[in-house]
Swiss-Prot record:
It is found in: Cell membrane. Its main location: membrane. It comes from the Eukaryota. Amino acid-proton symporter. Stereospecific transporter with a broad specificity for neutral amino acids. Residues 51-58, 133-163, 206-231, 296-312, 465-467 are extracellular. This is Probable amino acid permease 7. GO terms for molecular function: symporter activity. It comes from Arabidopsis thaliana (Mouse-ear cress).
Amino acid sequence: MDIKEDDESRVITPTELQLHDSVTARTGTLWTAVAHIITGVIGAGVLSLAWATAELGWIAGPAALIAFAGVTLLSAFLLSDCYRFPDPNNGPLRLNSYSQAVKLYLGKKNEIVCGVVVYISLFGCGIAYTIVIATCSRAIMKSNCYHRNGHNATCSYGDNNNYFMVLFGLTQIFMSQIPNFHNMVWLSLVAAIMSFTYSFIGIGLALGKIIENRKIEGSIRGIPAENRGEKVWIVFQALGNIAFSYPFSIILLEIQDTLRSPPAEKQTMKKASTVAVFIQTFFFFCCGCFGYAAFGDSTPGNLLTGFGFYEPFWLVDFANACIVLHLVGGYQVYSQPIFAAAERSLTKKYPENKFIARFYGFKLPLLRGETVRLNPMRMCLRTMYVLITTGVAVMFPYFNEVLGVVGALAFWPLAVYFPVEMCILQKKIRSWTRPWLLLRGFSFVCLLVCLLSLVGSIYGLVGAKFG
């Protein structure tokens, strides 16, 4: 039988979200904001930080981590001032999303550019997660093989991860039929717990390796390359990996919208950002520096799948299993906004088309007779998206290179350019004054770094594919 789209399954429009938000009680505090930020930034990106630190060396590696922390914190301060409009302290209009703020301050064209960058970033995360989950699944099998047959055994399990990527893609085709983001709270919670678990295991294993070695590995210049030009591009690729891990600009205004007042939301948000960035940086230092200190020039691109650790094999397996569970949920967290935007656009453009607007109900015995609602457009669109991300991952299964490209593409526009431009407009900073020059200079330097990181990451991606 067919069922008309009901309130639960349809896509909510921005106007309805704003009306719904206006009657929502805001009870958030400093510590809930800190928790939201930390949960949002601790993810698969931490697995590459040891490699990035190793490529940069003992001086440039920690310095880069601190520099990106400073840029992220400044971005958070600028963005938190844009939450209320037009006055940052008492403005009557609250902006509860990043895109909404960009549209109001910078106009429709900038909102479109912002949306394109966001969706490219989310798409890139889906590709990266597909690569990582295949690597981790294969690592679990190899770990058990090494434990049974010795560390010198031939445990290849094929020459690539394509089989595991296809399995993950099939799983995500099913998972992608979850109606919308509001039905995924449990999935996000599991993903957050898993990300912290495997990150702490990685730190613990690296620290144990340092104690076992009784020395700190590594050098000031980092891992040597074949020539100076090669080293330069790898360094910029490493910066792209760090850029992927740090920013939380996209979720900042949504978190700020949960805060109660007084005190003013921007004050609480700035304090929360400071605490969160401090914790984040300390955590990233542990992941990056402990990993490099443990393995030196042999630091793997992915700390938990490069087989620097063989024992305890059960703990290595458990860490990789946590990554798998995290990425099953994490893939959906990054994919659902793309699904929602595409479906909202098609529904608005073709409201009477049955293929797009009609839902069909089926009763499944396994669900105790409950009716499952399926929409043909949703099934086709989401399946096609999963197939594309899986296909790209199979074509370019290079973890660090893909992270570098995604990080370099998204960091400057989302964490620097838009916050700076909105701040200049909101505070009415006049051209060629000292604050204007400082903000524009800051934005320009970050742009140069991100462009070089993008070129370095693309160079590495092409080299890995065709070299």
